[in-house]
């Protein structure tokens, strides 16, 4: 992974978790060939372990195949919630939790 190719390493993306794609706004250009072009996504894999889906892939420079970053995305269901995480030098770090129920219990107000 190459910190010289990105504007900011592991930027905080809040709750924006990307299962695929690239965060091109954070890409300053390839440190090896000095070109700023689209990226290739290679070595994509999907694993399921203990009810958790893990998607990993590499971001590569389209021109010289320099490895810019390794992307990891996870999805799991915990109790009544879907949980997502993303960790990538280029795309950033993020996590999100969404209720699988029609009405999110976290948004309910208690009535006394």
UniProtKB/Swiss-Prot annotation:
Q: Where does Zn(2+) 2 bind?
A: 30, 33, 61, 64
InterPro entries (alphabetical): Churchill_sf (IPR038543), Transcrpt_activator_Churchill (IPR009508)
Report residues binding Zn(2+) 3: 59, 71, 88, 91
A Pfam family reported for this protein in Swiss-Prot or TrEMBL? Churchill
- UniProt GO molecular function: zinc ion binding
- What are the entry keywords? Activator, Developmental protein, Metal-binding, Transcription, Transcription regulation, Zinc
The UniProt function text for this chain reads: Transcriptional activator that mediates FGF signaling during neural development. Plays a role in the regulation of cell movement.
**What protein name is recorded for this chain?**
Protein Churchill
The organism's superkingdom is given as Eukaryota
Swiss-Prot/TrEMBL GO biological process terms: fibroblast growth factor receptor signaling pathway; positive regulation of DNA-templated transcription
PANTHER family in UniProt: PROTEIN CHURCHILL
Q: Where does Zn(2+) 1 bind?
A: 2, 5, 30, 66
Family note: Belongs to the Churchill family.
């Amino acid at each position: 992974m190459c910190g010289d190719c990105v504007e900011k390493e592991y930027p905080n993306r809040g709750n924006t978790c990307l299962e695929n794609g690239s965060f091109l706004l954070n890409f300053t250009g390839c440190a090896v060939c000095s070109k700023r072009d689209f990226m290739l996504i290679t070595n994509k894999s999907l694993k399921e372990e203990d009810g958790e889906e893990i998607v990993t892939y590499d971001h590569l420079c389209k021109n010289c195949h320099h490895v810019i970053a390794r992307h990891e995305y996870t999805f799991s269901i915990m109790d009544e919630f879907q949980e997502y995480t993303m960790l990538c030098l280029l795309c950033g770090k993020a996590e999100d939790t969404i209720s699988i129920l029609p009405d999110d219990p976290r948004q309910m107000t208690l009535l006394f």
